[in-house]
Amino acid sequence: MPSRRTGITTEDAITKYSVKAKTEQTAYKNATKDMVVQAQNIMNFYSVVNQALIPWLNAHGVGGNLRILYRQLANEYVKVLNTKQSGEVIKRLKIALRHKYWLRGLDEAMLDEFMDYIDSLKSTTTNYIIFNMQSSK
């Protein structure tokens, strides 16, 4: 007997729901796979960033909260470098980042040196910068 509100029989509603549920499950599985791959890419990115930056931070005697600030700066700067922007926009973003972290208490000369160090690490145009460890020696 069809529903008074919708006019659909119970069997039709069950059939519709079961088909809809399967497509939603497939979409969820695919989205979950993509999210896992993206999370793995991000984790690989951070491990490579740490491998490249920690020796520099150790060599310059940076520790404690300053180390966290330098790593935040590196992550933000890498995001800037990964944008598909022209040289002028990147220059301005670099100046803005430099100023932001200078206001947060980082030394101006070391900021310049740190950003130059990040620039010296070879980058690619993928979503995450891949550091070339040979260039850091």
From Swiss-Prot:
One of its GO terms (molecular function) is DNA binding. Keywords: Virion. GO terms for cellular component: helical viral capsid. It comes from the Viruses. It is found in: Virion. The N-terminus projects into a DNA groove. Self-assembles to form a helical, filamentous nucleocapsid. Together with capsid protein 2, wraps arounds the DNA and maintains it in an A-form. Capsid proteins probably maintain the DNA in A-form by non-specific desolvation and specific coordination of the DNA phosphate groups by positively charged residues. This certainly protects the viral DNA under conditions such as the extreme desiccation of its host. Heterodimer composed of major capsid protein VP4 and major capsid protein VP5. This is Major capsid protein VP4. It comes from Sulfolobus filamentous virus 1 (SFV1).
